[in-house]
Amino acid sequence: MILVGQFDSPYVRRVAISLHTLGMPFERNTLSVFSDAEAMRRINPLGRVPSLILDDGEVLIDSSAILDHLDEVAGPDRALLPRSGPTRRHALRTISLATGMIDKAIAIGYEHLLRPPELIHAPWIERNRVQLFTALRALEADAPEVGWFGGGRLNQADITVVASLAYVRFRTPWIAPLPDLPKLQRLSAAAEALPTFTQCLPAIEEIGGPLEEARAGLARFQGTA
């Protein structure tokens, strides 16, 4: 399998972490949605990441669809998303809050990165910031004091929440200061220390920009800034 995309994307990263967690070997194609847009569209017509190219050449797009396939291959006993009932619904709600946070952080980042300063729309940034912070507080209220969202076993809710938190930290120059999140910070630190997570940190080249800024961005991503 070949995973297309860079680890500065939380959607690519949650797929990569899931692949490592399930013990599924894969190669990487580190195309950028910006600098490699044409090549990206040849793989995914939308030019978005992640894509997963299966061994037979079939291309899966969208992280949720990819993760669904990985769970199917892994089987019900190893799947990262609970099979049914309240535990599944709770995991899906947690994942939805986390991916919603990602989308809000992306919207704020694009406002700063892609618009001329005179066209940045402060009310739109504030709306997204409020939505992001509300989701953060909801996740903090629901986060466990010990262990994982999935109880004694890390599951997809944990992976997606931790990937989303890393991305939000990465974007903190535009979102800060973040609210106090002791339970989420504990869970994030525990997860980010696992080899399955450390193998999926973005390279300096993937963060881009001047070297010192890229290093600072990586430190925020890791939660060490």
Predicted regions, residues:
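GST-like domain detector, emphasizing the conserved glutathione-binding G-site
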Residues: 1-123
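Acidic/histidine-enriched, glycine/proline-rich intrinsically disordered or flexible terminal extensions
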Residues: 201-225
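Short, hydrophobic secondary-structure boundary micro-motifs
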Residues: 78-83, 148-152, 177-178, 198-203
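GST-like fold's C-terminal all-alpha helical module
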Residues: 98-189
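Non-transmembrane alpha-helical segments in soluble domains
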Residues: 67, 71, 92-95, 136, ...
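Charged/polar, low-hydrophobicity segments characteristic of intrinsically disordered regions
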Residues: 141, 191-209
